[in-house]
Amino acid sequence: NIKVEKKAGGSVSDSQIVNGIVLDKEVAHSGMPKKIENAKIALISAPLEIEKTEFEAKINISDPNQIKSFMDEEDKILRDMVEKIKSANANVVLCQKGIDDIVQHYLAKADILTVRRIKESDMSKLAKATGGRIVGNVNDLSEKDLGLAQNVEEKQIENDNWVFVEGCKNPKAVTVLIRGGSQRVIDEAERSIHDALMVVKDVVERPLMLVGGGAPEAYVAVKLR
């Protein structure tokens, strides 16, 4: 439940622990807000788009008006997805799959910060950090499924934009963001942090330890003499 992200640049002293999850993703649409305070987060594992059928389908159109009707119906389906998100009072959407351009447009108009194509492992950590529930169908989304965070913000890390989900209350998952002057430095820092975390894990699971530096041998020698 500890996510480790690393980015070359700055110094090791710039490394930090985030009480939440850092995503190496940017906001999906340029018209969306880059920061949301008091975030109410919808975690959606399904695509926010019209799913393709498993079999090839053809539509016979005999009247130009039918094209408009077809496109209007498609637009309505996509718009209804956004309305469902709005009705749940979400102001942030974190989606594991793709999001249709039309859905992105309506989400931007509603000032809902959105991130797409998030890794499944990150979705699981987001649920643990925010207390939200991952929903497999947007139509099943309700306010009780939403996760909470003090703020969700897109920040520039060197030449990339990453999204920080921060200020989660009693998070069950957190992020360690490692910085350093070179890739070699941050790789070494990551190994050191991993070793330290494994030591803590072992001590918590089995509160036993053996001191080093020859102390056990010296103690035995004293007793034998």
Where are these regions (language model features)?
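Core, soluble structural subunits of large cytosolic macromolecular machines
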Residues: 1-225
